[in-house]
Amino acid sequence: MADRLTQLQTCVDQMLTQYFSALTHINTNHGFKSLAGEELVKDDTVPVVTDEERERTLEELAKDLVVKSQQIDYLIDSLPGIGSSEEHQMQQIEKLQKELEHYDQVTEDVIKEKDELLEHCDELILKLAQRKAHIDVESM
């Protein structure tokens, strides 16, 4: 799962796409009106859409934009640090830094212990090999 900032950026990108799609739809599916005293101009490349259908589509596009806005608001509200002071955030960072240093030390200690155990295993294997070689020499 993506982090909140990535989700927020994705939602903003999606909302911009929705805005563009809505504007494109409005631009291509608008109704023609005649100006005072002039005859109605028509464009054969523009599909004929009833007023009812146009309104229903515009309402659906508007609802989609509202839902996306709510998602963005939710993500913004869920960002860490919202509602806490800068001092509190700095204290939290210091606490996490100390925790990280502690776990770095634990990791370092475990690696050191692993190296010591490997060295001990090497010594034991070497002793066993020497004893086996000594036994093989005596049995000849």
From Swiss-Prot:
Component of the Mediator complex, a coactivator involved in the regulated transcription of nearly all RNA polymerase II-dependent genes. Mediator functions as a bridge to convey information from gene-specific regulatory proteins to the basal RNA polymerase II transcription machinery. Mediator is recruited to promoters by direct interactions with regulatory proteins and serves as a scaffold for the assembly of a functional preinitiation complex with RNA polymerase II and the general transcription factors. The lineage of its organism: Eukaryota, Fungi, Dikarya, Ascomycota, Saccharomycotina. Residues 52-130 form a coiled coil. One of its GO terms (molecular function) is transcription coactivator activity. Component of the Mediator complex. SUPFAM superfamilies: Mediator hinge subcomplex-like. Pfam families: Med21. This is Mediator of RNA polymerase II transcription subunit 21. The keyword Amino-acid biosynthesis does not apply. It is found in: Nucleus. InterPro entries: Med7/Med21-like, Mediator_Med21. One of its GO terms (cellular component) is mediator complex. One of its GO terms (biological process) is regulation of transcription by RNA polymerase II. Belongs to the Mediator complex subunit 21 family. Keywords: Activator, Coiled coil, Nucleus, Transcription, Transcription regulation. It comes from Yarrowia lipolytica (strain CLIB 122 / E 150).
